[in-house]
Amino acid sequence: MTQCTQSNFEFQAHFSRDVVARFDGGTISSEGGSLLLRQTDQRLNLLTRFGGCFLDGREQDRIEHSILEMVSQRVYGLALGYEDLNDHEQLRKDPLFGVLAGREELDKPLAGKSTLNRLELGNGQRDRYKKITFWKPGVDELLVNVFLEAHPQPPEQIILDIDTTDLPLHGKQEGRFFHGYYDSYCYLPLYIFCGEHVLCARLRSSNSDAAAGSLAEIARIVGQIRTAWPAVKIILRGDSGFCRNELMNWCEGQGVDYVLGLARNQRLRKIIGRQMWEATEQWNRTGQPSRVFAEFRYQTRKAKNRGWERERRVAAKAEHIDGKENPRFVVTSLSKEQWPAQELYEALYCARGDMENRIKEQFSLFADRVSAETMRANQLRLYFSVMAYVLVSGLRRLGLKATELAQAQVSTIRTKLLNDHRLKVGGFGGD
């Protein structure tokens, strides 16, 4: 049987130039897979809108490097595995990066590390050298808009996952505090996802409650979603770090359902004493992990005005595993008719574990590179990593369906596709 292998691939033209990728094109530029990201960006219109979230105080007739070019440099660089500004001292000379950044004159280099550094350090104040700043509300709104645009029709129901993680610090950055749980100096960013879509990435100091600021972010996101999809049903899902009376009260008042982890205590353990005994007996008979589920109404005791004002439904898992008790609890606004206790815990609550994979992908895109002096600059670095994630996940969603990379992590996509040095790109010399 005759087998035909396509020898070249045509991409969106770059001004008057054709862009063609071949597997025998020499060594002019070896990041040929990055053109797939360029195609994805043109579908999403991501980087143009992201660049529009910056305020440029420079004299426009004396500008050598536009904001869009510099923003594109940083985002594409992170997506392709170039985490350091020093990397751009070489990348700026690569004609393919010129194509990615949208530069028309490919014989001229892109911005160097010092110029890119000034892009990060702008604080909105009058400064001779740092005249660019970014508008956080605009970036936040863009993330939600990308999520909304990914759906041709409004879904009936969505689940918002909320979580936090630690970004270790090794210098004297602004907002640096020691966190006992993580046993290190760190930032404590707040992430909110819906499936693979990142809706919020808020940098925070680690000297506050894990849920600090979460209500404001949820209210903002829910408001924007309901403006576009007024009939959508929304469920908020998070661990016990977000089980706060203020947040649950707001959800109940706004018609947002929730399922949140509930930290165990002696009162809760006593309530499920019979189920815990049954689970232990099953383990004694079989030697296998055993689970017994229960549900009940529960209200915390008020302490320093932090208790619950009302009873709420709690689902419990009485588990005995490896010779030890392992009780777990979740509090929810969902009824038992909608979600019986076992299904609520196993099928709905435990599915939040997938968000941990999405957070790991942020680290694959260098979200932990927060070594700038100010929190504002480090928030921008976090945004750069998030935009790189949106770009690669967009490629995964739009371009890799029904392929072996359809469910791959972004690091795998980078290694197997974006950084495949067998794909060379040439032909940058003429019109």
Label each region the model flagged.
Residues M1-D209, G213-A228, R396, H421-D431:
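Dynamic "connector" segments at or just before major functional cores
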Residues T2-F23, D257-F363, V370:
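An anionic, glycine-rich sequence signature occurring as long contiguous blocks
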Residues T40, H88, L344-M375, L380, ...:
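Short amphipathic alpha-helical "interface-anchor" segments enriched in bulky aromatics
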Residues Q60-E69, I321, A372-L382, A408:
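Structural motif
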Residues D163, A231-F242:
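Acidic/histidine-rich, metal-coordinating catalytic segments
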Residues M248-D257:
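Short, surface-exposed basic-aromatic patches at helix termini and helix-loop junctions that form
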Residues L391-D431:
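A short, flexible helix-boundary coil/loop motif
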